[in-house]
Structures are given as structure tokens and as C-alpha cells.
């Protein structure tokens, strides 16, 4: 029997903007994606808000960040901050 680590896929990662950093060691990231309407075929934006773990409280509101999925860290938090791509001005 093969080990479970070989059969698992890659973890998802998202690029988004920090919309809240008021939690201790936590941030809320808004991730935008383009979705096509099933009937009218027009593209529009949908926003998903994900809570992520920020161990050092280094991300601020307006920063562009990369987050990745991980094991559940709390009721709503199952992502980690990987890097800050661009700091807010």
C-alpha cells in the first residue's frame, strides 16, 4: 500500500487584498474571481472573504497577500499567510 503523502494533491493558494486586521494573529482577505453567467454568458466578479492566520501580525489593511489552505485552525480559519506581495501605500 502506498503512503498517503504521495496521493494527495497540491494545496490551494489565493491572491487577495486584506480587508481587516483587527484580530490578533488573524486577517480577513478578500479574493476576487471572475464567473460567467450560465444563461447570458456575461462575466462578473464574485468576492470571497477568507480568514487567514498571520502569526507575526505583519499584514495591514490594503496589503496584497498570498494565502494557502491548511488544517483548520479555528471555527472559521483554515488558511495561512504565505507572503505579502505588496504593502499598502
Curated annotation (Swiss-Prot):
Transmembrane segments: none annotated. Disulfide bonds: none annotated. GO terms for biological process: translation. InterPro entries: NA-bd_OB-fold, Ribosomal_uS17, Ribosomal_uS17_bact/chlr, Ribosomal_uS17_CS. Keywords: Ribonucleoprotein, Ribosomal protein, RNA-binding, rRNA-binding. It holds the Pfam family Ribosomal_S17. One of its GO terms (molecular function) is structural constituent of ribosome. GO terms for cellular component: cytosolic small ribosomal subunit. PROSITE patterns: RIBOSOMAL_S17 (PS00056). Belongs to the universal ribosomal protein uS17 family. One of the primary rRNA binding proteins, it binds specifically to the 5'-end of 16S ribosomal RNA. Part of the 30S ribosomal subunit. This is Small ribosomal subunit protein uS17. The lineage of its organism: Bacteria, Pseudomonadati, Chlorobiota, Chlorobiia, Chlorobiales.
